[in-house]
Amino acid sequence: MTTILTCPFKKLPTTSKWALRFAIRPLSCSSQLRAAPAVQTKTKKTLAKPNIRNVVVVDGVRTPFLLSGTSYKDLMPHDLARAALTGLLHRTSVPKEVVDYIIFGTVIQEVKTSNVAREAALGAGFSDKTPAHTVTMACISANQAMTTGVGLIASGQCDVIVAGGVELMSDIPIRHSRKMRKLMLDLNKAKSMGQRLSLISKFRLNFLAPELPAVAEFSTSETMGHSADRLAAAFAVSRLEQDEYALRSHSLAKKAQDEGLLSDVVPFRVPGKDTVTKDNGIRPSSLEQMAKLKPAFIKPYGTVTAANSSFLTDGASAMLIMAEEKALAMGYKPKAYLRDFMYVSQDPKDQLLLGPTYATPKVLEKAGLTMNDIDAFEFHEAFSGQILANFKAMDSDWFAENYMGRKTKVGLPPLEKFNNWGGSLSLGHPFGATGCRLVMAAANRLRKEGGQYGLVAACAAGGQGHAMIVEAYPK
């Protein structure tokens, strides 16, 4: 099949007026920055399945998401994960001994705490009899932690699960070069002074050059930012459109923060420093200021910049999920049901960031829903260009037929229902923790706005993606 990034896009809008085709007013207009009105909808069918246990979210919390290199810079990942767990315990008052299992997602592992879920659980005071494990699936690691928990509960293996995720980008592992590592290991095995001196004689100064963490995809040798730039170009997403969307994200996040809607954030007293109470990456600017920034990846003609990309972020999240009957027996009023979910994978070269486009129709079909049934959309915003490219792909019959094997397009999420309290562009994106934030945002929005169904979706490195249906718990 002709590569997606070289073939001309048939029946896809190719001008900056694509928003008119979608019946979307300019993203920067004030009407788009107001919170959406409560969804006036009749109660729809429930998605409960016969002979399968209902899994509910009791509540979820997260530490404030901070720009890397700021207040969390002297911590370790398990410190943040422990803070999220402690915050969850305080929020829910769940007895530690009733938790059957703890699962956390993370991407960049600290060698000292490779099973960060276990170390954080012990640090937060959970019983040493409570098992814990860590999963990694790039930007959908927390999603995998949650759905693993859903499976354990639905199958009857567990009743109470804590799922979450953590990422600390302020202190990523920087290794010695491979030659230096080999030399040091060989020196450790040497049995005589002669052997040691012989090995030392092989040392060269260039052995000291550090090995920085890879930022490119292993399978393609391309950075995600570079891929986002190519994807935006393939779908004719302009720089202005990307900046407008980023401005929308920051403006809505600031509004939600000021109005106290980001209730999943719990204060965290950083040892030796002040208490952190809110996300610090929310920075509404202006299109004029954003236009001054130079391309970050493809220079000089690229359209992806620091302003329309998510930033390196430190943070952790945690959720208490239970079998419905267990939650009710303990006196809890759950926030939402976790319903159908779907994982997808596609070409990591040309479709790296199109996970939401592929996962959305599959999870809707699995749940027996349509786009019109969804009251709250929460999509991970890696880049503005990624979001807008997914919009165009989802609104294209041609793309659906030629790349997805579908007869009709997926359909476009209504912008008035989309990421109404900001997204990863503004709130931040700690790789391993974002999935829980998305689900809690959907659950909290459904309660606030009066909707019934939420759709969470995210892309991930490796050309993978995830989507999940969240159903509001009856009030």
UniProtKB/Swiss-Prot annotation:
Residues 174-221 dip into the membrane without crossing it. One of its GO terms (biological process) is fatty acid beta-oxidation. The active site is at C139 (acyl-thioester intermediate), C459 (proton donor/acceptor). It is found in: Mitochondrion; Mitochondrion inner membrane; Mitochondrion outer membrane; Endoplasmic reticulum. It catalyses: an acyl-CoA + acetyl-CoA = a 3-oxoacyl-CoA + CoA; butanoyl-CoA + acetyl-CoA = 3-oxohexanoyl-CoA + CoA; hexanoyl-CoA + acetyl-CoA = 3-oxooctanoyl-CoA + CoA; octanoyl-CoA + acetyl-CoA = 3-oxodecanoyl-CoA + CoA. GO terms for cellular component: endoplasmic reticulum; mitochondrial inner membrane; mitochondrial outer membrane. PROSITE patterns: THIOLASE_1, THIOLASE_2, THIOLASE_3. This is Trifunctional enzyme subunit beta, mitochondrial. It comes from Macaca fascicularis (Crab-eating macaque). The lineage of its organism: Eukaryota, Metazoa, Chordata, Craniata, Vertebrata.
